[in-house]
From Swiss-Prot:
It catalyses: 7-aminomethyl-7-carbaguanosine(34) in tRNA + S-adenosyl-L-methionine = epoxyqueuosine(34) in tRNA + adenine + L-methionine + 2 H(+). GO terms for molecular function: S-adenosylmethionine:tRNA ribosyltransferase-isomerase activity. It holds the Pfam family Queuosine_synth. Pathway: tRNA modification; tRNA-queuosine biosynthesis. The gene is queA. It is found in: Cytoplasm. Transfers and isomerizes the ribose moiety from AdoMet to the 7-aminomethyl group of 7-deazaguanine (preQ1-tRNA) to give epoxyqueuosine (oQ-tRNA). This is S-adenosylmethionine:tRNA ribosyltransferase-isomerase.
Amino acid sequence: MNTDDFDYELDEKFIAQTPLDKRDESKLMVMDRFNGNTEIKKFYNIIDYLNPGDVLVCNNTRVIPARLFGHRPEKEEKIEVLLLQQTEDKWECLVKPGKKMKLNQVIEFSDSVSAKVVDITEDGSRILKFEYEGIFEERLDELGNMPLPPYIKEKLNDKERYQTVYSKHNGSAAAPTAGLHFTNELLEKIKDKGIYVVFLTLHVGLGTFRPVKVDDVKDHHMHSEYYTISQETVDIINRQKSKGHNIIAVGTTSVRTLETVTHNNNSKLVAESGWTDIFIYPGFEFNIVDSLITNFHLPKSTLMMLVSAFSKKEYIFDAYEKAKQNDFRFFSFGDAMFINGGRNV
């Protein structure tokens, strides 16, 4: 299976640069998972496709303002740091220009925040140990910028627009973008209809933006991301699944968490925390997820491979062509797709 098989053409005009004023007024392409039939709706119409007893599974991670700018002592050249992953009191980071930041060199971000390079990983990431006054999260809020994807050139005026309304646990370097379409009001209407809304956490890493550089899909390796799923969430999903109800994953991160856990535990969903580098591409067998809410993804990306695995690659590519014909907005701030594999109970 070749990486180029997941390529498609996309004019820059389709790439959404800013979020819509109202989250749930984005367009929604509803696609039948099993026959590829499509309908075009608004996102707030998602409730019409959910039945009482169904379960909506959301990722409640919260994006940290992980992009920092500093400089070396006595130097004016700007150093950009992107926080990837925290381990105890150290952070794995992408640093630009990386070659200049050797072991034991220091980056100053402000009078009260600096960091020292204490290790360099095999792939060139830097391990930084921060020195700061007060509480690190507060300093980060003051100094950090939202780590928007490289294809978004416009400045984001409101940091909260790159967070889901239900974001709770700090730790992501990118938003789980399918969840950006939900408003609190829409979620309340969904609950009032008898649909369960449950949460898990997967902290999204920068592997989300990293291109697939190998020709053969099977040779690609994913970066590990931390996840946790509670007993309460597991109990609701297992109970409703056993009754034949539809398990709807909000976003590819929710899919990857649920399928990681079931593949780790003989197809059973259990409460656990851990790290996942699961890579889902066509041929993958899904254990738990019936339907998927997702955005429109980059050509040749691992997310394009995941949605192609979830339905049929031909259906996905046909839907993307229809999306372009109907002026859908693509990528992180773009419109949504609902791949519906549910059964009416």
